Amino acid sequence: MNTLPLDEDSCYEACAGREHAWDGHFVLAVTSTGIYCRPSCPARLPRRENCRFFVSAAAAVAAGFRACRRCRPDRLPGEMGWSRREDLVGRVVQAIRDGVVDDLGVAGLSERLGVGVRQLNRIFREEVGATIHQVNRTRRAHTARMLMDHTDWRLGEIALAAGFGSIRQFNDVMRAEFGTSPRGLRRYPEPETARGGSGRIRLTVRLPASGMQAATAMRAALAAHAVPGVEKFESGTLTRLVNTPAGAALARTDVMGRVELDLPALGALAPTLGAVRRWLALDADTATADALLSRDPQLAQLVAERPGLRVPGVVDGAEFAFFTVLGQQISLAAARTVQERFITSHGRPAPGLGEQWRLPPEPAAVAEVGENGLRESLRLTRSKAATLHALAIELAGELRVDPWTDRGETRSRLLGIRGIGAWTTEFIAMRGLGDPDACPSGDLVLQRALGLATSRQVLARAEAWRPWRSRAVMHLWTKESYL
């Protein structure tokens, strides 16, 4: 099964109209040429009988098609629509985007999801039209193509950085994806790559992104919450520390898709790119969300003023959960102060990056400090120290805060911690879980913006926004300058 967002005739009509809004939702494959394209491809529309439609680029490649060199579907954000799905297949797609398959393998992923490998592969293939390995292979190929566009690296370096196990595998996959060898794809642009004297790797890339018209609001939201030690906002640019299995990396961005990377090794590239895409919500389906929210009289003007507004994600889910608890019921300025104190007191050195950067502490290390130690080092109330300690114990155990976890189970675990209520849980869901339909209905600023008095009234009002309640909340918070 290849579950398309439209019936095939409607897909063809969208391609005939070259509708950019459908880019990333499906691809058009042409049997007479053997290529697949984005729906908005400017090439002449093929005859209907020569068209096939696939829900993902990987499914088209698995069926024997290669990427169009004119519309470059590999430059699109990842397949959209998956972020609002919390079923098993949606969670696997999110995990592939985050590089989890490279890290754990399919067997490790299936264990984390609590599903047998064969069952997981079968369900995924029926829904997506390609195997987990094939979708992950397509992700690697698109990363490699991006590096060819932006660096002068040797092909062997590109293969390693993109996650390929060998040059032969790299050559075979690139030929299957693009119809030619890696050498045939090379254009040798003006390089934006440098190697520091410390052996670190620096390069600039432009990541595919959808709807960046509201980048100013996104930048303001991230800047307002930037915590020294792990983040820095300076001259309109955000810099973020990323912890990878290969070491500590830095990502500097204008949030428009341009990213300057400072890497400890080639192996840090893929996890850093995944973290940045998640942090900036670059795969968000902004067009579909805007279309639905624009129907609401109270939101229509806000959407018109900030089309494409996204809800920021996070780089480190455990860190974000700690920060959210530390920021409960205090001002934003006070929250940043105690969050910085947390990083300074309990964070770890970031090798190769200087003293201004600190890796966030592992949950087990925070749990080891104990309630009294946290209360004294962070100057917390007894109740907040107890909540932070209980959260650390859960995070050191089975609690996960990431976009590919079970959202319902994570919410239940969070609500089971004394001191964590609905607002904290929904805020963590909005950003840490990447849930597009989270709704912190008890938020006083949200209630004021809507002119409502109770959480129940907000929930009733927000029913019309499903499955994009998080985006609606972001619009209302931005309107109220509550970032």
Regions found by a protein language model. Give the residues of each.
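HhH-family (HhH-GPD) DNA N-glycosylase catalytic core used in base-excision repair
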Residues: 1-483
